[in-house]
Amino acid sequence: MKTSKDSSNSNSNNNNNNNNNNNNNNNNNNGLNGTYSSKSLSPPTSPKQMSGNSIISNSTGNLSSGSGSGSSSGGNKKFINRSFNTFIDFIKKPARRNSKAHNTPPPYPEVDTGFGYFLELDSKPPKPFDEKDDPIHNSTGSTDSWEGDLNSSGGGGKQPQQTQQQSSGENLNNSSDRNNNSNENNQIVDDNSNVFNKGVVVQTVPMTEIGLFPVSLMMAQQRAEHPINVEDIESDVQTCSIPNSKPLYSSLGCSTNSSNSGSSISAPNITFQSFGISPVNNNNNNNNNSNNNSNSNSNSNSNSNNNNNNNNNNNNNNNNNNNNNNNNNSTVNSNNSSLNNSPRYLNSSSSPRSMQHLSSKITTTTTTTTTTTTTTSDDNNGNTNNNISNNNNIINNSNNNSNSNNNNNNNINNTNHKFKTMEKYFSSKENFPIPFPKLKDELGVIIENSSNKGYVGGNKGSEDRRKKIEQKKKQVPAPEMKATKEKFIETITDPTTLNSFRSFMENTQSNENLEFFLEVKRFNTIQDQVLLKHTCDDIWRRFFDDLAVTQLCVESSLKKLINNRRENPTHSMFNEVLDLLLDDIVCDAFRNYISSPFNPEWKSEFKKKFTNNTYSTTTQPINNFNNTNNNNNNNCSTPPNNYSSSPIKQSNINNNNNNASSSNIASSSNVNNNNNNSNGSNTSSSHHRERLDNIKGNRERVDSNGKERSIDNKDILSLLESNLSNHSNSSSNSNGKDKDKDKDKNENTTDNSNNNNNSNNNLNNLIIKNNFNNILQSPQIVSKINEIFKDSNNSQLSISITLDNDEDPTIFHLDESDMESLIEEVVKDNISVHTEISYSDVSIHKWIASGSSGRVYNGQYKGKDVAIKVLGPEVCVHFDLNEFKREVALMSIFKHDNLARCLGAGQYDDKYFHLTEYCHNGSLFSYLRDQRNNISFGQRLHFALGIARGMRYLHSMSIIHRDLKSMNILLTKRLKIKIVDFGTSRVANKYNMTTHVGTQAWMAPEIFTSRTYTNKVDVYSYAIILFEIFTRKSAYDENANINIPNMVMKGERPELPKDMQTSISNIIKKCWQQKPSNRPSFIKIVAYLESIIYPSVSNSLGLVASTSFSSSALWSGQILAQPKN
């Protein structure tokens, strides 16, 4: 070619050979000693068709010449697919400067393409590595191929590989010259005159027909002093998209080039290149190459100075890239990374938009010239010293470009981007559906914020709410009764108050501390030394032994002290532990008890305060809840302040006979004082009229959203109107009569008084006994629902509610219909029962589990570990907002030690979340099946008792769980039972139930067959859980193909082990009876289990538990434990 002649003539100049080398390298992409082979391919329709295509080839499919196409025989292929991180780690490794270090030939199997692509290698074992076979480091130009016997299109067997320079008559440098040149210039020249930086291992692996287009990948290992910039890879990954193809999850510098006229590949080549390495040489139009060569020849003949060499480079750039610049044409300032770390795009005009954006970072050489760029010449040229400084650059146009390259490198590093990990694009981790703030574990400090002391900063709104709440708490007067040790001793001494306090502990907390205190109290009364020793051992076994179910939380030093005193027990041996627990009980449990409805004294004080402040100013003792026919005590309660803004004042009447008394509603007249009685009645009537007007005026109320809601108080209004009519009759009867008819007048007024008493009693019943229904009819007057509890005196279901403008709560009685109505009002958002929490106040730590019902995360709220359950249309398979509200309502208003308490709930867009206390030991299902957990028989009884107590409380609240199973029972760090998942819970109503609710293995037979079932379905589920607890196995084989509903409906049950304790097997059999009425209630189950766990308590109460547990008398409604004879 003309190029070779001009190249020899221009060696006298400094760097003219640079251009000639660049021009000659246009057609040497196929010149890597025939190491790779290719075949003509057509686009496959699926990835499976790739197995028949050899994808290790040169860029254009040329095997032995610069034009034309070659083919190779197919064969058994294997795919290598590794992660992207493997590829990154490979690039970051130090350069292999000795080719003998490779124990396998290129392409090296430990290197993969990443990005979901595969390298297809020949299944034949490779030949032993020989230095002469290395296409880069070897200078002999071996014609052998690593692919074995590859047949070209022209014939079979191995064929020698010839470069374009050899075919055109160009004389190549010999091995010694090239090796010397490599040593001096720290560069390597291959047989095709391609120049590579020493220490850079380059392999060209064209990927064919993946994603409906052929691609070429060049992977290389850059030297350690030039690490790869991963950020640019991420930017390529994020922006790269190729039409009509599968999505590219990563691409390293792809650009499209027109294929050679002689190539058989129809689709455009997509060239992928790593950073800081030499790009692939693609074959371009020969006409353009010849033009470039002629330009370089003319320039080289006219260049005699160093600056002429720069003009030569400028000419090349002007003809190809239209970059009319000086030395800076070879480099372009980049704001993202240095030129060593930037991809090089060969054809920016035909590349996709994302490629054009990134290709602007680098100035390429001519469009038709796609050669490696570091230039060198023979030793006689004298140009080596001028080009050594340009090794850091991809393109070195002249010896004078070193300064411009340095300037570019300085400009490149102006903006340093923060390193980002690749998990954002190449990770299978679930993203958080709600942007909770991350938990700052690495800081190890708690962030102080305005709303709480936690890991999350609060906003201004939460701070304002907190200040309002604290201000409101300061306004509320403290309870009159104080929690002191003397008061506590007095409480547990009285049997009535002891039962009330025990009921409070059962509903809110555990009874270990209280039971220990009572046992020690009994222990101190024993005088017999033998009995004292026996009682001491029993107390140790119950409260201090490591296997004790009711073990106390005390220090090990105190346990050792008690253990040492067991040999010679004294009455004072438990004093240290008793003082410690006494402080805990008084400061925690007893303090909450004295201000709770369980305390009879607090209830009486509350009634007095409520009556004096709201209804009357009298100083007489008033009992609002007891109505008698005696008119003197006829002081009935009235609706809250919301119904009437002005309370009725007592009329001042002079009673000579003390027969007339004032009332909120009416006052009776006296025959001996007609005028005064009439005035009193008229005064009371005027107050009633005023009250009636106030009630009618408040019938229209506006809520926070500006929507008007009417208040329906027809019952109250009708009673008030009837009372007013009675008052008017009383006044008319007491006036206009003569003194001689006083007796008749007295009878008339007495009748009116009786009418008043009857009407007052009816009103009292409406307000006290059945008034909660009226509250539900106007739910906007409810400020907060505090809790629902069982009254310890009359065992009646009660609810504590705070009404608008009231500081103290009001207690109402409930029935099943009221409970159902309450839940419906909560679902309608008319009543709020939970604490509203902003997602920014919750910090998230880690993912726990995901399922069809939502996702669960572990996080922190106000410095406490919480479980965060996230639900929503995008998170749940079947999301029901009403079910979510119902679950939050039940978990918020029910307070029990064995029920998971909802700490609050919130919303973010269309996703919802609620917080519960975090249970470290997971579900009971997984805990039982983990064989590493050593679970004693006592611990299993503890599990059974905790579940029974929680379900006893739920059933007492008229709630059916309907999905009771071991997966919905969690264990805290101290293995305390917590029942969760109240989404399917319903108010006990046997006439309106949904069939097939729950999990089949735990479902009662009546659920499959009928819609009319009761709370006994939970008892059946409890029997299956007992089977799991005491066998540590599933009730039904999970792998067996069995029809559980048919088995259950036929009366078939899991087989109980023969070595199971009789007391346990009997209760299981009784709980899964086919007929629901034959199953025991949880009240009886709890009593029986407690008699097993606490035999000394049962003995001290005079009760003995039945050993058979199969007697029908014990389950037919009688008490479970029978008294001693």
From Swiss-Prot:
Annotated keywords: ATP-binding, Cell membrane, Cytoplasm, Kinase, Membrane, Nucleotide-binding, Serine/threonine-protein kinase, Transferase
Residues annotated to bind ATP: I848, A849, S850, G851, S852, S853, G854, R855, V856, K869
Domain (RGS) ranges: 487-603
Keyword field contains Kinase: yes
Biased composition (Polar residues): 343-361
Disulphide-bonded residues: none
Record comment: activity regulation: Up-regulated by cAMP.
Molecular function terms, GO-annotated: ATP binding; protein kinase activity; protein serine kinase activity; protein serine/threonine kinase activity
Record-linked CDD domains: STKc_MAP3K-like
Purpose of the protein: Serine/threonine kinase involved in negative regulation of chemotaxis.
Name of the protein this chain belongs to: RGS domain-containing serine/threonine-protein kinase A
